[in-house]
From Swiss-Prot:
Keyword Iron: no
Chain spans, region Ubiquitin-like: 1-88
GO cellular component: classical Lewy body; cytosol; glial cytoplasmic inclusion; Lewy body core; Lewy body corona; Lewy neurite; mitochondrion; nucleoplasm
Name of this protein: F-box only protein 7
Lineage: Eukaryota, Metazoa, Chordata, Craniata, Vertebrata
Record key words, sorted: Cytoplasm, Methylation, Mitochondrion, Nucleus, Ubl conjugation pathway
Residue span of region Important for interaction with CDK6: 129-169, 382-523
Compositionally biased spans, kind Polar residues: 98-128
Positions bearing Asymmetric dimethylarginine: R519
Region (Important for dimerization and interaction with PSMF1): 180-325
Domain notes: The ubiquitin-like region mediates interaction with PRKN. The proline-rich region is important for protein-protein interactions.
Classification via CDD domains: F-box_FBXO7
């Protein structure tokens, strides 16, 4: 195996004579051969890394287990230059590989980027998410279908305090004692009777995470395909959206304490062998576990198995299938493995996820994955309710979002200021004591005035306090009818023609249109 070794900005070729070298053999070869040629002592202590940061540990492990192939670049870091030793992480499989021409690669492995933890991305919870796809006229109005109890639950859910850690969504994100929800559901529905069955269930889930679609089942990650095991032999058949016209078949045969997984493809009626992997069930499945036990107690080292199985079988199988079908090279977000798409979509808000789903059919399928919507639901709503395996997480998210918006609308209405009160009237208007009102004209005996002679004016209490011209200012006007039947306009300034007005030069001058009354001197 030929490798390239970089130390302090200097790169040297190195040839390891062993066919399947381990990390310890590589370390010894570097100390005896490479370090003296670079001017260092063979006793110099160093760390082997792939990214100049994370040291590889486990001298008994083979280089292939870390994804190192011929032509790869490895970096040496002297211990004097390292501030603190780093534990192996999910970035251990990062490598900038120069793969041989006889082994084409489709895309980088999902472990090449260490996505930061999204547990602190819950800041969008206090904001109203303005995605129009769920508030258009095509959707049902929230005020018509949301019950009061659900609204109260949504309001109380927002007031829950505390930290709610997210569960792992993929197998390469798990730690000891953790399994993805999809693996728990799949394991409980499979009815495993031995550790070989449990390992095949895990292999099936890894194929699903890589974007393969199983044949023989309509659901994606709830149940195992039909006739997946027969007479001690396991057989799984898949298709892939990027390999139309080709079928991938996994034949798993238990041999002693090993399981041999042979990958073949069916293209144009022919069958071609692609790859073969040997797995030891005892390394990833705990022995002596009773049926019905939690999957977290059954499986172990899921991160390691996910890296090995995908790097050594899944992605080479996908690349070889495209090569056999003579398909051109593809690039971009659409052709990324499904697990990388899910990890990208998980970092987005729901409005952006729905916008991406409207771009093309492939992104629509990826954005409708139930694993993604379960993760988004737990991130945005922090609901700890245990739900069944057939839960529609996208529909549940939509209902909870509508309830939250309705609860926010109700909470906003509760704190709105009340309408302005009616101004205080200093002079009350008394209701009429006798109903109906007298039918007599105003001013006639027995009319409105005689019913309440104490009040200055019942009809207009405000203007009654304003003295008219020629009257003395006071609290009340003189007690008299509002309208005089003889002189309808009482007061000293009558404007009717023929009336006597003080300071008039012609007090008895007839008005226009009528003669003077000749009977006035005799009266």
């Amino acid at each position: 195996m030929k490798l390239r070794v970089r130390l302090q900005k200097r790169t040297q070729p190195l040839e390891v004579p062993e066919s399947e070298p381990t990390l310890g053999q590589l370390r010894a070869h570097l100390s005896q051969v490479l370090l003296p040629t670079l001017g260092f002592s063979s006793d110099t202590r160093f760390a082997i890394t792939l990214n100049n940061k994370d040291a590889l540990t486990g001298d008994e492990e083979t280089l292939a287990s870390y994804g190192i192939v011929s032509g790869d670049l490895i970096c040496l870091v002297l211990e004097d230059d390292m501030p603190a030793p780093n534990l192996p992480s999910s970035t251990d499989t990062e490598h900038s590989s120069l793969q041989d021409n006889d082994q084409p690669s489709l895309a980088a492995t999902p472990s090449q980027t260490n996505i930061p933890d999204e547990q602190g991305t819950d800041s969008s919870q206090g904001q109203a998410t303005p995605f129009d796809a769920w508030t258009d006229d095509s959707m049902e109005g929230p005020s018509q279908n949301v019950e009061a109890e659900s609204i109260q639950d949504a309001m109380s859910m927002e007031e829950v305090s505390g930290f709610h850690p997210l569960e792992p969504m993929l197998c390469n994100e798990t730690e000891d004692g953790q399994v993805p929800h999809s693996l728990e559901t799949l394991y409980q529905s499979a009815g495993c009777s031995n550790i070989s069955d449990a390992l095949i269930v895990l292999v099936h889930l890894l194929m699903l995470e890589s974007g393969y679609i199983p044949q023989g089942t309509e659901t994606k990650a709830v149940t195992m395909p039909e006739k997946w095991k027969s007479s001690g032999v396991y057989k799984l058949q898949y298709t892939h959206p990027l390999c139309e016209g080709g079928f991938a078949v996994l034949t798993c045969v238990p041999l002693g304490n090993l399981i041999i997984i042979n990958a073949t493809i069916k293209v144009n009626g022919g069958i071609k062998n692609v790859k073969s992997v040997q797995l030891q069930p005892g390394s990833y499945v705990a022995a002596g576990v009773e049926p019905g036990e939690s999957a977290a107690k059954v499986y172990k080292d899921l991160k390691k198995l996910s890296r090995l199985f995908k790097d050594q079988l899944v992605y080479p199988l996908l690349a070889f299938t495209r090569q056999v079908l003579n398909l051109p090279d593809v690039f971009g977000l659409v052709v990324l493995p499904l697990e990388l798409k899910l990890r990208i979509f998980r970092l987005l808000d729901v409005h952006s996820v729905l916008a991406l789903s409207a771009v093309c059919h492939d992104l629509l399928i990826a954005s409708n994955d139930p694993l993604l919507w379960r993760c988004l639901y737990l991130r945005d709503f922090r609901d700890g309710t245990v739900r069944g395996p057939d839960t529609d997480w996208k529909e549940l998210y939509r209902k909870k979002h509508i309830q939250r918006k309705e609860a926010q609308r109700m909470r906003h209405a509760m704190f709105l200021p009340s309408a302005h009160p009616i101004p205080f009237c200093p002079i009350p208007v008394y209701p009429r004591a006798y109903l109906p009102t007298s039918l007599l004209p105003p001013g006639i005996i027995g009319g409105e005035y005689d019913e309440r002679p104490i009040l200055p004016s019942v009809g207009d209490p405000v203007t009654s306090l304003i003295p008219r011209p020629g009257e003395l200012p006071g609290q009340f006007r003189p007690l008299r009818p509002r309208f005089d039947p003889v002189d309808p306009l009482p007061g000293p300034h009558s404007l009717l023609p023929g009336r006597a007005i003080p300071n008039n030069r012609f007090p008895f001058r007839p008005g226009r249109g009528r003669s003077a009354d000749s009977r006035l001197p005799f009266l």
